[in-house]
């Protein structure tokens, strides 16, 4: 078995098996990331949300919390993603 990755693919070994890249030699660096998404809905649904008329509560606050939780759990959701210390997460 060889540890040399397939040409151009750092997350696969020479046999094509998925591997987690060794980042122990990397220096800590400041990083920033931006994600964007869209939610499609009926105009009536949007009006209810904006008026606070949804019976189950504040939809936008729950969505904001879900975005923050998603950022915190990224290594659990994306295969082979290294956990990084987060200092801030903002959801607009």
UniProtKB/Swiss-Prot annotation:
The keyword Ribonucleoprotein does not apply. GO terms for biological process: Mo-molybdopterin cofactor biosynthetic process. SUPFAM superfamilies: Molybdenum cofactor biosynthesis protein C, MoaC (SSF55040). The keyword Nuclease does not apply. Pathway: Cofactor biosynthesis; molybdopterin biosynthesis. Catalyzes the conversion of (8S)-3',8-cyclo-7,8-dihydroguanosine 5'-triphosphate to cyclic pyranopterin monophosphate (cPMP). Belongs to the MoaC family. This is Cyclic pyranopterin monophosphate synthase. It comes from Azospirillum brasilense. The gene is moaC.
């Amino acid at each position: 078995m060889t540890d040399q990755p397939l040409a151009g693919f750092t997350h696969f070994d020479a046999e094509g098996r998925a591997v987690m890249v060794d980042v122990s030699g990397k220096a800590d660096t400041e990083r920033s990331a931006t994600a964007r998404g869209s939610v499609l809905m009926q105009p009536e649904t949007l009006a209810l949300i904006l008026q606070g008329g949804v019976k189950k509560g504040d939809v936008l606050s729950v969505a904001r919390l879900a975005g923050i939780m998603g950022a915190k759990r990224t290594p659990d959701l994306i295969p082979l993603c290294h956990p990084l210390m987060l200092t801030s997460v903002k959801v607009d």
